[in-house]
């Protein structure tokens, strides 16, 4: 079953369970007056879409959630075309400069942790790859040269290697290339790219020789068709992210809120609702909720309208949950 169909069923189940257990899903207090415009990361999309659906069902108003990749989302955000930008990496220095030039101020809010997941077809014999083997598959020098699995490592099968991955506007592309190749956006180009992670899922599900990488939630929704590959002997999971073993492919994900948009009551209500329910909904759609302390700090930053980013235009690789908390507390 496709991810989107699973997500719709899942959200219905979330509402039922939350109602039964008395979780924080109380109706938003008043009807919104305008549409909340959101765009950006496909990785963060499932969380934000889950929030938007609940928010609308509880009378908060309408929020539209688009997908154009983290980089594509920031382009719109810094032009003032969206109220909130989903991001699977921190905002970069060039994007900060673009926002500043357009007079767009923003508040940075971490919402969850992701285990960026490398997947293969369930019929593929590969169960573990090293970061060095991944680099040999994906580095620019591999283009036109590494077309079989055993060309990346002699221990792998003599079979065609077909690669799927996010496009260059994706924050996942930025993060993966930095973590695996050693330089952001440094990648071979002879692979099948898409900003729609469901396209990547379909590609691998139909081809026993394919490999792809994307956010953990998309793997979790398709475990009957895909197999996660252990990286340096460690499989992605909530546990291996929390104990810092799944490195370097674990990372925080964010939303960025236009400070001017927060003056609109419906945007303020939506953002408050998001932060009050991010832990529950991020876990429900397949990501790893942050510690309660992280959400408390984020809510304080939101309440105080703390403008800017704790990352100073950099996108660090392998940032632990503890390191994220330290940055947030010192900001």
Residue ranges and their predicted role:
Residues 18-27:
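C-terminal segment of classical bacterial N-terminal signal peptides
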Residues 2-14:
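Bacterial N-terminal signal peptides that target proteins for export
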Residues 1-2, 21-22, 44:
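Extended interaction regions within the primary functional domain
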Residues 26-331:
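Flexible loop/hinge segments at secondary-structure junctions
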């Amino acid at each position: 079953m496709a991810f989107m169909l699973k997500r719709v069923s899942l959200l219905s189940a979330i509402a039922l369970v939350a109602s039964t257990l008395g979780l924080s899903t109380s109706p938003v207090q008043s009807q919104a007056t305008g549409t909340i415009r959101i765009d950006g990361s496909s990785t963060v999309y499932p969380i934000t879409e889950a929030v938007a659906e609940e928010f609308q069902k509880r009378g908060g108003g309408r929020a539209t959630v688009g997908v154009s990749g983290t980089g594509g989302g920031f382009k719109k955000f810094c032009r003032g075309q969206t109220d909130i930008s989903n991001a699977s990496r921190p905002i970069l220095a060039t994007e900060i400069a673009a926002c500043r030039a357009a007079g767009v101020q923003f508040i940075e809010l971490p919402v969850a942790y992701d285990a960026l997941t490398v997947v293969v077809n369930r019929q593929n014999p590969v169960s573990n790859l090293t970061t060095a083997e991944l680099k040999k598959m994906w580095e620019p020098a591999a283009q036109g040269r590494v077309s079989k699995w055993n060309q990346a490592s002699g221990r792998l099968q003599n079979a065609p290697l077909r690669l799927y991955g996010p496009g260059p506007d994706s924050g996942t592309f930025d993060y993966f290339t930095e973590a695996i190749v050693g330089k952001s956006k440094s990648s071979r180009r002879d692979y099948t790219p898409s900003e729609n992670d469901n396209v990547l899922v379909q590609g691998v599900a139909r081809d026993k020789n394919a490999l792809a990488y994307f956010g953990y939630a998309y793997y979790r929704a398709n475990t009957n068709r895909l197999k996660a590959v252990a990286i340096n002997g460690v499989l992605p999971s909530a546990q291996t992210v929390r104990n810092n073993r799944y490195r370097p492919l674990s990372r925080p994900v964010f939303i960025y809120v236009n400070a001017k948009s927060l003056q609109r009551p419906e945007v303020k209500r939506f953002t408050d609702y998001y932060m009050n329910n991010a832990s529950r909904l991020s876990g429900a759609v397949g990501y790893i909720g942050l510690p309660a302390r992280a959400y408390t700090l984020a809510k304080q930053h939101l309440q105080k309208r703390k403008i800017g980013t704790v990352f100073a235009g950099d996108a660090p690789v392998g940032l632990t949950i503890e390191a994220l908390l330290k940055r947030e507390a010192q900001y």
